[in-house]
């Protein structure tokens, strides 16, 4: 249980997908103009992470790993293709659910909802998980079973959600601020993201 909590907290604050690895920046910048829309996308990304990582963990350990199916056969070269296929399938399911039950959110997210399928934060989480399976049990980042994968996925999703909602809240306030003309738009947004990332750097020294 302690290891699960450690993985969860680390993935939110220490190994935040946005502020530590800058993954998923395209949709992060494009959909962070409104808090409501940002919350919707953040929840969708979190859901996709929580569903895809356990599936990809199973594929990695039971199918792709060396000697997993047949002695002497290593299918790890197929990991990119299979991971992307799983992510795309789950995203398609999420898109259909959102369109059915929340048409306004579906319209607000626009093209960025199906683009979750190529959101590098989700693919990055699967690849980080793939690496962490092999680091050894003594490493705090170790992912040794499906529950570790779920904990890491949930933390990564919540970390991404916090990042996009935080930026959206700031950008809503900045819309009424006297921003210099040269910095309006993405200029002041990049500065804001940089300051937020620097703030999250204070967590990097935590020994969790």
Residue ranges of model-derived segments:
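C-terminal ends of transmembrane helices
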Residues: 23-37, 91-105, 167-178
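Cytoplasmic-side transmembrane-helix entry/capping segments in multi-pass membrane proteins
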Residues: 37-47, 78-83, 105-116, 182-188
């Amino acid at each position: 249980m302690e290891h699960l909590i450690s993985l969860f907290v680390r993935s939110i604050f220490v190994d935040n997908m946005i502020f530590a690895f800058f993954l998923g920046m395209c949709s992060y910048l494009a959909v962070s103009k409104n808090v409501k829309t940002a919350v919707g996308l953040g929840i969708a990304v979190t859901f996709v992470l929580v569903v895809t990582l356990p599936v990809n963990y199973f594929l990695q350990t039971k199918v792709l790993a060396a000697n997993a199916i047949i002695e002497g056969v290593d299918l790890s070269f197929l990991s990119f293709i299979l991971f992307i296929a799983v992510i795309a399938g789950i995203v398609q399911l999420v898109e259909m659910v959102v369109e059915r039950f929340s048409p306004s959110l579906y319209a607000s997210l626009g093209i960025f909802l199906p683009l979750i399928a190529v959101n590098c934060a989700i693919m990055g989480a699967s690849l980080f998980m793939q690496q962490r399976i092999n680091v050894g049990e003594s490493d705090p980042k170790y992912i040794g079973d499906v529950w570790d994968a779920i904990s890491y996925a949930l933390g990564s999703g919540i970390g991404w959600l916090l990042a996009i909602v935080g930026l959206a809240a700031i950008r809503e306030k900045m819309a009424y601020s006297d921003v210099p003309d040269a910095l309006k738009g993405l200029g002041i947004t990049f500065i804001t993201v940089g300051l937020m990332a620097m703030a999250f750097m204070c967590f990097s020294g935590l020994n969790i």
